[in-house]
Amino acid sequence: MTYILFAIGLLGAGFVLSCAFGSMAEKKWPQQLQKIAYGVNGYLLLQGLLGKVHVLDNRGLDGYFLFLAFVCACIVLLSLIVRRIRSKYVSSCRMLRFAAGTIAVLAAAELLVFNFNAYHLWMGDYTETRLSLSNVKIENGDFVYDRGQDQLTIRGKGEVLLTYENLNQPVGTLTVDAILGERTKSADVIVDITDETHQEYRYNTVNMRLLKDAPRSHFTTCELSGKVGTFRVKFTLPEDNDSITVRNIVINRDIPFHFSLLRMGVFLTLILLGYGIVHSTLLRRPCYREKLFVRAGAAVITAVCCMGCVSLVWADTNRPIKEIFEREQGNQITRELVDAFEAGQVSLKTTVDPALLAMENPYDWSARSAENVSAQWDHVFYNGKYYSYYGIAPVVTLFLPYHLLTGKYFPTQFAVLLYGLIGVVFLTLTYLAFLRRFHRSLPCGMALGGLIVMQASSGIWYVVARTLFYEISIASGFACVAVGAYFLLTSNILSHGRISCPRMALGSLFLALAVLCRPTLAVYCIAAVVIILMGLSRAGKRPGVKLAAGKLRSRRIAYLAWGAVPMFLLACVQLWYNYARFDSPLDFGIQYSLTINDFTRSQFHLGFVFIGLYNYLLAPPKFTWTFPFFFTEFTNLNINGYYFSDVGNTAGIIYLALPVLCYLLAGKALKRLNKRDRIRWSIIIGLTCVLMPLVIICSIWESGYAIRYTADFSWPILIGALAIGFYLYRHTKNQTWRKVARICMGIAVPAALVLNFAHVYTFKFPDWVALEHYGVFNSLAELFTIF
């Protein structure tokens, strides 16, 4: 009966879809059968609903009928829209027909691929059997069998074995009906068997991990040969205070169909996004003709990114918000620096262990451990006092004012989130300003696609995914660089039009503030100084107005003052702060860190530079059948020596953001420019988007590889590549090459979303913390796992 119902549903859906697609193709016969198609669609819906309320016995196919009815209804609706608008909107009809075809293909994938296990028992002679808990040999561990309710309760970490002898029947599926204890997150089930091919035990033949509130984790398929003889089920719990109550163990129960509209929606969005960039008339229109659409699209993209950042931080928020914002404790940045500044000193108030003062070399981690000397980890130790290497900008702009106002310490995770959100918003604003000034004629799809790739590959995701105190400096620096870039770009210093000195000053201020967040970001200040000097020749000039030499000179002096004073003042603050701590204005103090290595004696090795360059730029992702399907291995390039690698790693940016490959076309772009512009843009892009990011990557040779550093350089690298690619697109008249460029962007957008999501997810939920978030982990894994 199950096969008959399945065939009826499939034939009915096939008929409805044939009519719908025939109608979109302007065939005559579908119009004659239209009402019958509506009736068949209604039947599929009614069959599913009556099964849900137990009026009909659909043999577990209720969801199957409802799914077919929904898919058919969607495609019929699209066919009706196409029939109404086909004479006026040819391009829209093509997009709708493609969407309908994509929905049909995705529905087939749902039915045949993602529900592959539901057909498992259809391929053999299997009989559903409940394995009794009363007639089974139970060994080992702490267990209690309740004969009245016929259920078994297991407690603690000890392994409990249930052995069923002389089963003598094939086993195609295993279902464990069990309730996990209140604090129990998982239970492992392992099955050893004997079958017709092996009279002794085959160990670990079936493996399951039962998860709480995840019913689909309680059944699995079994690929066994012939009849099973002995069937031994082993239960193991991870903690001593865990428990599980086993109510039923059933073999050969049908695995139910499970259809996910969310999964279909994700795939549909990615496919339509790529297709639309290539073929959609709307997305092929120039940005200047669709300003409102581009802004709205950018706003939606930014809002989604902000929600993603919030969700990553929220996943680790397990206390009431009020309690989090009333913290009495903090870390080196949120509390120790705050207390020190309030006390009017630059050294931290933390007491130094006398044993540390007495050590010959306190910077040797192994020596401190061997002598059992207490030391503050990742603090700077100089002249008998503790200091902080980390930037003071977040302290004076957020943590200190908050403590002065409330008497509490601002929470780290929400500080990282706040700076991350500011950075995400201003990254979009910077990108839109970049388009408005240089690429107004670029197609909307290319423009929005570039924004998606840039936001997805910006690196800020790894920062908000793990909110330790290290990430405060990264996130605040990311925000300041994005804000500074926005004001510098909108000052018209790089483009035509009157230069806005106040905006240039704000750009200078925030870029300098970035250095007070993270000293490494000083490289962007150097680039900004060069750019400001390059704009000096245009300073004070107005179109059609000729100024006297003296007035022009005074305006240029004022221009330089606007650009230099904010940066100079903050540089003086940083230099004074360095001198007050380490007796030298140029000493940031990192070599005095009590950390993984003795930086006072570490030596430079060129090979360590190559490790960073390879892993950040070139490391290829690998595919695996385990969700989220892509991962990248960190490699030290077989270079001998101690090189620190933090938890987590990502693929090279050339894979995460495919448009970075546009740098290979830089020569073609430069040939189209006159000599003056060729030199100008070589300096601007080469310095800001290539050289300075490479300097940052090379500078981490001493501190080692950490995934969070990608937020320092990823988006500047990408925006330079996009500038090259967009320029070539606008200046080529070959429509074939333009289409190839749109296809490349159509591929780059889904690729960036998939690869970056996979690496961020793996970083956020590595194996050793997955069970802490078992609900999220299992739900996402279930969503995309086939077997």
Model-identified regions with their sequence ranges:
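Transmembrane-helix motifs of polytopic, lipid-linked glycan transferases
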Residues: 408-440, 483-487
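Hydrophobic, aromatic-rich transmembrane alpha-helices
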Residues: 13-23, 628-678
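Interfacial juxtamembrane loops and adjacent helix segments
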Residues: 343-390, 431, 454-465, 595-599, ...
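Transmembrane-helix signature of polytopic, membrane-embedded enzymes
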Residues: 30-42, 427-459, 479, 496-503, ...
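Start-transfer (signal-anchor) and selected internal transmembrane alpha helices
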Residues: 2-37, 66-116, 262-330, 447, ...
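Specific aromatic-rich, kink-prone transmembrane helix
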Residues: 476-496, 511, 525-528, 716-720
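Membrane-interface alpha helices of multi-pass inner-membrane proteins
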Residues: 482, 503-518, 525, 566-574
